[in-house]
UniProtKB/Swiss-Prot annotation:
Domain of life (superkingdom): Eukaryota
Keywords, alphabetical: Disulfide bond, FAD, Flavoprotein, Mitochondrion, Oxidoreductase
Disulfide pattern: C119-C122, C148-C165, C177-C182
Catalytic activity: 2 R'C(R)SH + O2 = R'C(R)S-S(R)CR' + H2O2
Segments carrying motif Required for dimerization and substrate specificity: 177-182
Physiological role: FAD-dependent sulfhydryl oxidase that catalyzes disulfide bond formation. Oxidizes thioredoxin in vitro. Required for the import and folding of small cysteine-containing proteins in the mitochondrial intermembrane space, and can act independently of the oxidoreductase MIA40. Can oxidize the cytochrome c oxidase assembly protein COX19, a typical substrate of MIA40.
The record's account of how the chain is modified after translation: Contains three disulfide bonds; one catalytic disulfide (Cys-119 to Cys-122), one structural disulfide (Cys-148 to Cys-165), and one shuttle disulfide (Cys-177 to Cys-182).
Residue ranges, compositional bias (Pro residues): 49-63
Boundaries of every ERV/ALR sulfhydryl oxidase domain copy: 72-172
Description of how the protein assembles with itself and partners: Homodimer.
Lineage: Eukaryota, Viridiplantae, Streptophyta, Embryophyta, Tracheophyta
Protein name: FAD-linked sulfhydryl oxidase ERV1
Gene source species: Oryza sativa subsp. japonica (Rice)
């Protein structure tokens, strides 16, 4: 196929594309059959035009739009609530008789939070609170009560209400997990016996 009068353009693969396109027009599915329009369609179609843009993803369900109509970073208060929720849930799941490593992990978790917490002034305050009130993680009850006490120390400094720590298990009790699957120690069974 001779080059077009206007030249090959700037794409170095353009001659190859034109040659392959011309060759594919001449291929027949069944060479001994009479040519018809369907059989003369190219088996291969190459184009130098950009690929079509993929369809845009479907919009989120309406309940997602209603729930969070603002697309903004979390506030300091929202991060605080989420952090306390996580910590109280961890304390509620903490073993009644933790291993030395689990007690160490509880202390280290609090130390890490005091270093990495996304609110600098909150992290500094939490370091002070931890220094004055070292982590108590000898059992689930002790860890939960200590965390409730520390949470109340923070709440007092913010002028927020104090939570009655005798109700901590009613508020943050163990997760409802079948066959103790929420236990930190878990079980050695890969598949539970039925």
């Amino acid at each position: 196929m001779p080059p077009p009068a206007w030249g090959w353009g700037s794409n170095p693969l353009e001659p190859v594309v034109h040659t392959v396109a011309a060759f594919s027009r001449r291929l027949l599915i069944a060479p001994d059959a009479a040519p018809d329009e369907a059989r003369l369609r190219p088996l291969l179609s190459l184009s130098l035009s950009p690929p079509p843009t993929p369809p845009s993803p479907p919009p989120p369900p309406p309940e997602v739009l209603k729930k969070d109509s603002k697309a903004a970073p979390l506030t300091k208060e929202e991060v605080g609530r989420a952090t306390w929720m996580l910590l109280h849930t961890i304390a509620a799941q903490f073993p009644d008789e933790p291993t030395r490593q689990q007690r160490r992990d509880a202390r280290e978790l609090m130390a890490i939070i005091s270093r990495l917490y996304p609110c600098k002034e909150c992290a500094e305050h939490f370091k002070e609170v931890l220094k004055a009130n070292p982590v108590q993680a000898g059992s689930q009850a002790e860890f939960s009560q200590w965390l409730c006490y520390v949470h109340n120390v923070v709440n007092r400094s913010l002028g927020k209400p104090i939570f009655p720590c005798q109700r901590v298990n009613a508020r943050w009790g163990k997760l409802d997990c079948p066959e103790r699957s929420c236990d930190l120690e878990g079980s050695n069974d890969i598949i539970p016996n039925r």
